[in-house]
Amino acid sequence: MYAIEITVQGTVASDVETKVTESGRSLSKFRLAANERVQDRQTGEWKDLPTTWLSVTCWGRLADHVTQSLVKGTPVVVQGRLRERRYDREVSGVSVPGSSLDLTARVVGPDLNKGVAQFRRTKSPAVRRAEERALAEAGFASAAAQPFVPDSS
């Protein structure tokens, strides 16, 4: 089976659910509503086409950053691997086939066509540890390791 890589503009349509797997890896999920607008050439009116719904899954640092950055209603651009998941569900005692579009995200960002954002770079745990080691070797303790002592003057 070949992977389908896509880029989708849409709106976060659910709260972001966050979990940590048994192996300690972060996982976040949210629903994405993608709406396409087209202009009627004869009337000039804009019309919304039916909404395409996707379930988006993010892993690792991306999952951590999505959890900290996105809320329901945020316009986003998501790039990743698309798969159709088929399932059966019971409706009034009858098994009914269904399907879902699942997108495993590689990149998620704000849709700057819809607003502005301010980017804040994060440091990886390895970089933070290296900086703390360098400070310790230079005779400085990290601020987190130093107890707070109020000024007595």
Regions found by a protein language model. Give the residues of each.
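Acidic, gly/ser/pro-rich intrinsically disordered tails
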Residues: 1-2, 20-23, 43, 110-153
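Well-ordered beta-strand positions in beta-sheet-rich domains
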Residues: 29, 51-55, 86, 100-102, ...
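Core FKBP-type peptidyl-prolyl cis-trans isomerase
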Residues: 2, 6-51, 91, 95, ...
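A beta-strand/beta-hairpin structural motif
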Residues: 42-68
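Beta-rich strand-turn-strand
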Residues: 59-91
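OB-fold/S1-family single-stranded nucleic acid-binding modules
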Residues: 83, 89-115
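OB-fold and OB-like beta-barrel modules that bind single-stranded nucleic acids
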Residues: 8-13, 32, 72-84, 105
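Generic beta-structure capping elements
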Residues: 32-37, 81, 106-108, 120-122
